[in-house]
């Protein structure tokens, strides 16, 4: 927009008085053009990294939030009048992420989680589904890094929860469509979930954002009472979770991918979910798992599924090869198109191989070569859907005394995977208790509170495992599959060699090669020596980073609770300064570079 000098001057003048925003019709991204950051960008480039590459004059338009002002005639691109009302009277906490802060790159993190929408449009949508008046009280119910939930309450006692995704939640349209379909499928299977009243995958609706309107989860969050619950009631919760897994594992699914309602996807990119007639409204489509769409990956034409695993026999794992290969080929395509090595004098530069796109591509191609051999070892390729993030906050129960599960929430990002990849402990009990969690000795009895808590955690996990062996033996066996460690590591690391660490992926691949007979690839002694050096350097960095995070009490990206932000920010600056004093020895230039390198510095 604004490709001529005259039109740009006109726009800048009007921006001082109007609520204008730029809108990319392709990516469904919205950004206020009157923000100071954008006014400084003469080209009006969208500053959100997720949408920057969608910016082309032919696909952008400017929408006026003030309806009676015509667009500048000098603009040659498409213009239209927005139906999104001004947000000046709405609480800014509705649109902004307020549940946490970041001690580095906070501006970008907050911008990625800002949701622009029409409050009145959302209330109107809620009124339609409930058949009541539009006079709702609206409060922010909660938010995570990828969603925001609001409670809309009517004076008649009716209420509804509205769930809106952020720009980093996943692919536009598909993420909401898949979440709704998965929730509806869970209800059909008898797994307690909130009822979906209505939804929109279209950000150009009257709400101005994708949304899901659903009933409020019944009961209380398990998180609020778990610490006070005794073994018996904890065991009751675990038994119910294992029984729900049984219902999921009983489905005979036809392939891999994410779940959709047929009405939300064209037939050309779907597979039937199952041969079961009762599931005929559902289908499998592209995976909405975030790594397939992160950064510029959504710009690449790649195979994201669905993938059918039954061309010959399930046990042959023919299409398990394809799902593993697709992720590796995705990274090859992304590296070829977008990976840019840092200059030799850049302090951020890592090892030579890490900064060499060809080294990544060569190693990924080696991995693709051994995928058929890897899948020969896999005993459980059957398509499986399990909850991806079963923590205490996602489970609701009637009460502490009646721990009957009333709702399981947050099915966003769910996908059907081979059982060998899908098998996981519920995150609420995912404690590390050794290589063999079934036969590990219990920690000794002690009066130490921390040790007692560890003992209780081990007992809960062992109880879940015992019930799983009893009711879901294939799931239990998948945890003990000999190749599982290699399969999971290669599956994970093959999707992030450039943004993660090539040495970690190479290490996983070497370990697998060493256990194989007649492997088609090999690593020379010289390659292994260089790898050992790079792996040691990488492991040292991991130790330092983990130690730093532990000292500051932050996440990997620097997230911290709002009440701790000032204290942690000050501690971070002091650590950075003290470390620079110790290492730089008065060298001002190196000190400046070192402080820029510091893990929790703005980039």
Report residues per predicted region.
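Acidic surface patches and DE-rich sequence motifs
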Residues: 4, 154, 398
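Active-site acidic catalytic loop and adjacent metal/ATP-binding pocket
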Residues: 149, 162, 366-421, 599
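ATP-binding pocket architecture of kinase catalytic cores
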Residues: 137-358, 377-385, 403-404
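Intrinsically disordered, low-complexity basic segments at termini and long loops, enriched
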Residues: 1-59
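Long, low-complexity, polar/charged, intrinsically disordered or flexibly structured peripheral segments
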Residues: 294-376, 520, 545, 552-562, ...
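Active-site Asp-x-Gly
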Residues: 385, 398-514, 518-521, 543
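Short amphipathic alpha-helical segments that mediate assembly, nucleic-acid/protein binding
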Residues: 8, 14, 58, 234, ...
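Conserved NTP-binding catalytic cores of kinases and kinase-like/nucleotidyltransferase enzymes
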Residues: 35, 44-223, 227-231, 239, ...
